[in-house]
C-alpha cells in the first residue's frame, strides 16, 4: 500500500478492472470505493460533512453506462462512508467495452450549497448515444421543448418525426395538444399507455417480445423518443448528502436555440454569492461559457443577461472577492495562460478580462477563495501531469477587482494529474479530490491553509 499511494493520500474511488487501471492499483479497490471506472470529481462541504461526487463508469469513456456516485466524510476527510449510487441511467446494455453505448448516461457533476443549506448537484444527462464524441447522431433539427400553457415543456418524437408534448402532470399530448392516453416520468424515461409499459424514451430500439415490464437497470426503447442531445439534471439533498431527490430536468428554463445540441455543465463546484444567488457554470460546444443562476435555492433558474455567451473558453470555475466581484477562470485551448472573465453584478453579466498569468494545459481546473486569497488546482506541465495548488490574491485597478496576482505553488503529485476539485474543510484546512490516473483512481489530500499561503 505504501508503494502505491503517497503519505497523506486517501483512495476515495478506485477502479477494479485492469482494462482501465494498472492491475496493482486495482488491488486497492473494494466494496467501499470500487467500480469498473471513475472520472470527474466534485467535492464540497455541507455543514460538517464532506461530499465527494463522481462519474461511476462502465468503461472509462465519456459515454456508456455511467451512474452518479458519492461518498461522505463526517470527520474532515479522515474516514469515508461506503460508495452510494444516487442516480442510475436507463440502459439496454451495461457492457464494459468502450464500443458499447446501449445506455443513457450521466456525466460531469457540479455541486454547490444553496442559501437554505441544501446541496445542489447539477449534471449532464444524455439519452442513449456517444454525446459529443459522435455528433452525427445528435438531433440537431428536433426541438427539445415546446411552449405549452406559457411554459417550455419537453417534447417527444415518433418514427415519422411527429412531435408530442409532455404536460406538467406527465400526460403525453399529440402535436395538436390532444391527450394520447400515454403518460411518462420524463426524467426516468418510463413511458406507459394506461398500465401497459411501452419502454424508455431515452433509449434506442423498440420493445422485444419477451419483455413486458421495466427493470431496474436494463430495459428497452419506447416508440416515442426524447431528442438526442445534452440535458441539465438537478439533484438535491437536504440532509448533507445522506439522501437525494430524483433528478429534475431544468434545461428548458435556460436553453436558447443558439446553444445547439450541447449546453453542458462545467464540472467542479458552483458558487453561492454573498447576496445568496446560486450560480452554476455551463459551456457550449463552441467553447464559450454560460452562467445560470437561481434566487430561490435552486427551484427556478435564469440565464445570464446581455450577450448569451461569455468569451471564457470551455470548462470554467469561479470565485468571489470580498468586494463582491466574481472572477471566472476558463480552460485554454492549449498550454498557456488562463482565460479570465469578471462579473460586477452578481453573475448577471460578464466582461472578457483577457488572460491571467496562471499557466496550465488544456484541462479543467478548480478554484476557491478564502478572503483575499485564491487557491487553484491544475496540472503544472504542458500535458496533464504534475498537479499543483497555486495561490494568489485579488488585486484592484481603478477601485475595482481586476484580476489575481499568483505568487506561490505547492506540489500535489508527480506524474498524471487531470480533473480536480478543491473545498474548504474548516478554518485551517482545504481538501482536494483529484484524478491521479487517466481513469479510475481518485485520491483525496488535505492541506493546512497556512502552509499554502
Identify what each model region corresponds to:
Residues 3-453:
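Asp-box/BNR beta-propeller blade signature and adjacent active/binding-site loops
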Amino acid at each position: 500500500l505504501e508503494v502505491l499511494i503517497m503519505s497523506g493520500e486517501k483512495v476515495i474511488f478506485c477502479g477494479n478492472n485492469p482494462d482501465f487501471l494498472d492491475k496493482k492499483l486495482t488491488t486497492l479497490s473494494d466494496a467501499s470505493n470500487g467500480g469498473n471506472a471513475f472520472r470527474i470529481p466534485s467535492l464540497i462541504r455541507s455543514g460538517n460533512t464532506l461530499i465527494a461526487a463522481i462519474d461511476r463508469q462502465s468503461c472509462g469513456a465519456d459515454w456508456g453506462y455511467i451512474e452518479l456516485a458519492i461518498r461522505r466524510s463526517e470527520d474532515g476527510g479522515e474516514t469515508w462512508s461506503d460508495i452510494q449510487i444516487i442516480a442510475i441511467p436507463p440502459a439496454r446494455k451495461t457492457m464494459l467495452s468502450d464500443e458499447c453505448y446501449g445506455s443513457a448516461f450521466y456525466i460531469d457533476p457540479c455541486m454547490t450549497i444553496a442559501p437554505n443549506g441544501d446541496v445542489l448537484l447539477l449534471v449532464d444527462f444524455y439519452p442513449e448515444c456517444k454525446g459529443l464524441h459522435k455528433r452525427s447522431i445528435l438531433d440537431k433539427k428536433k426541438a427539445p421543448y415546446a411552449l405549452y400553457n406559457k411554459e417550455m415543456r419537453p417534447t417527444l418524437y415518433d418514427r415519422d418525426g411527429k412531435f408530442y408534448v409532455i404536460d406538467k402532470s406527465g400526460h403525453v399530448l399529440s402535436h395538436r395538444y390532444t391527450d394520447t392516453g400515454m403518460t411518462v416520468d420524463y426524467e426516468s424515461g418510463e413511458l406507459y399507455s394506461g398500465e401497459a409499459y411501452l419502454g424508455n424514451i431515452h433509449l434506442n430500439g423498440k420493445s422485444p417480445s419477451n419483455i413486458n415490464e421495466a427493470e431496474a437497470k436494463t430495459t428497452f426503447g419506447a416508440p416515442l423518443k426524447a431528442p438526442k442531445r445534452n440535458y441539465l439534471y438537478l439533484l438535491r439533498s437536504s440532509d448533507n448528502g445522506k439522501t437525494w431527490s430524483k433528478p429534475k430536468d431544468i434545461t428548458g428554463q435556460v436553453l436558447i436555440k443558439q446553444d445547439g445540441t450541447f449546453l453542458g455543465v462545467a464540472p467542479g463546484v458552483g458558487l453561492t454569492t454573498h447576496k445568496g444567488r446560486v450560480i452554476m457554470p455551463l459551456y457550449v460546444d463552441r467553447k464559450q461559457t454560460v452562467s445560470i443562476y437561481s434566487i430561490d435555492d435552486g427551484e427556478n433558474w435564469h440565464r445570464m443577461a446581455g450577450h448569451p455567451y461569455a468569451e471564457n473558453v470551455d470548462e470554467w470555475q469561479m470565485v468571489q472577492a470580498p468586494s463582491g466581484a466574481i472572477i471566472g477562470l476558463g480552460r485554454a485551448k492549449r498550454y498557456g495562460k488562463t482565460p479570465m472573465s469578471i462579473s460586477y453584478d452578481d453573475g448577471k453579466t460578464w466582461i472578457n478580462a483577457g488572460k491571467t498569468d496562471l499557466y496550465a494545459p488544456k484541462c479543467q481546473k478548480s478554484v476557491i477563495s478564502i478572503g483575499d486569497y485564491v487557491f487553484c488546482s491544475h496540472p503544472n506541465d504542458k500535458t496533464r501531469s504534475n498537479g499543483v495548488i497555486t495561490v494568489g490574491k485579488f488585486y484592484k485597478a481603478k477601485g475595482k477587482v481586476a484580476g489575481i496576482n499568483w505568487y506561490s505553488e505547492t506540489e500535489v503529485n508527480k506524474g498524471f494529474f487531470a480533473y480536480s476539485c478543491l473545498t474548504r474543510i474548516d478554518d485551517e484546512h482545504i481538501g482536494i479530490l483529484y484524478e491521479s490516473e487517466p481513469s479510475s483512481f481518485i485520491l483525496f489530500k488535505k492541506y493546512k491553509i497556512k502552509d499554502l499561503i
